[in-house]
């Protein structure tokens, strides 16, 4: 699934947004579950992916599309937490803070840490294609947070052209497109502004 920004506010609610600002009301229950997993939280903005996993722990887009299992949120970036804006920090520093931040979460939570691999991009991509995953994202580890389509962007999405679950992806996003996008040039900008 395309990246979803997650806004957790006062540990009472969590809202997910598509990167273009459209809210994902389809995942309201996931947001509540995540908010409950962070009882001592003030505010946070996480960037990550909403996925459903099969028995082997692999993402299954069709399960997400047809709500066949409970989704979870894999956080791969921390943009804002407990009053601090991390977007200008290096990715590697944000990952350290994210791991520290998620240490508060119980192991059975639907909020999970998405780890990274350094220096083995080609081998990782070959493995991803072999097990039929969507692709990988390559990021500059010392770069600041830069949303896609922005001059500050320091990452590249590399897609598996033979990914078997590509069909139907837009259908999931269209469910919530009838709603107006949240004002702001980018969902993470809005989320960080609301959290501050």
Feature map (PLM): residue ranges:
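Catalytic cores of nucleic-acid ligases and guanylyltransferases
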Residues: 1-196
